Curated annotation (Swiss-Prot):
Protein name, entry field: Deoxyribose-phosphate aldolase
Disulfide bridge positions per record: none
Entry keyword set: Cytoplasm, Lyase, Schiff base
Taxonomic source organism: Streptococcus equi subsp. zooepidemicus (strain MGCS10565)
Main location: cytoplasm
Length: 220
């Protein structure tokens, strides 16, 4: 298994600066990670720096609360793609899901899918805020909306990915939709446990630590 190709090497902190982006990009090149996941303001910079490599540029939409309008999320998506994004990680409208407004949640996801063209869309369900029934419903709505991946977490709420959530999400979406475990992979052991549970992508700031077989303290 090439665990490096599962990793979205992530830097989403509000106070991240260009020197940290440069380090992230160089590490992603060195380890041939699947992508770098960066905030929208850094997409054009990352895309230019990674041109000619296999490393994709991933960014976030409606992040981290998911509470912007669908039109805003669609605009963010188009803007990110124009700037060079290959993959879009959007946050669902969690409040609408919890109050049972399922069609609105699905339509919100679909707005981003339609805005993305042929680019990859991952939807973040923020599993730490949901009951198991809500997690299942969110994944079902995501499949209906035509997304490419479901993703556990933003890394900015009360918890990150768990093995049990990854298993439940994989069981719900079946074999043809990706599952991204985000937040919580601090070591190679963690990463392998998520893959064993059904993850096909891992969002983490500890990608280098994982590749070295070490354990990270803190981070995403």
């Amino acid at each position: 298994m090439n665990i490096n190709k599962y990793i979205d090497h992530t830097l989403l902190k509000a106070d991240s600066v260009q020197s940290q982006l440069d380090q992230l990009i160089e590490e992603a090149k060195a380890y041939d990670f699947a992508s770098v996941c960066v905030n929208p303001c850094w997409v054009a910079y990352a895309a230019k720096a990674l041109k000619g490599t296999d490393v994709k540029v991933c960014t976030v939409v409606g992040f981290p609360l998911g509470a912007t309008t669908s039109a805003t999320k669609a605009f963010e998506t188009k803007d990110a793609i124009e700037n060079g994004a290959d993959e879009i990680d959007m946050v669902i409208n969690i409040g609408l899901l919890k109050q049972g407004d399922y069609q609105a949640v699905e339509d919100d996801m679909r707005a981003v899918v339609e805005a993305s063209g042929d680019k990859l869309v991952k939807v973040i369900i923020e599993a730490c805020l949901l009951t198991d029934d809500e997690k299942v419903k969110a994944c079902q709505l995501a499949v209906n909306a035509g997304v490419d991946f479901v993703k556990t977490s933003t890394g900015f709420s009360t918890g990150g990915a768990t093995v049990s959530d990854v298993k439940l999400m994989r069981q719900t979406v079946g074999p043809d939709i990706g599952v991204k475990a985000a937040g919580g992979a601090r070591s190679l052991e963690d990463a392998l446990a998520f893959v064993e549970a059904g993850a096909t992508r891992i969002g983490t700031s500890a990608g280098v630590t994982i590749m070295k077989g070490e354990v990270a303290n803190g981070g995403y």
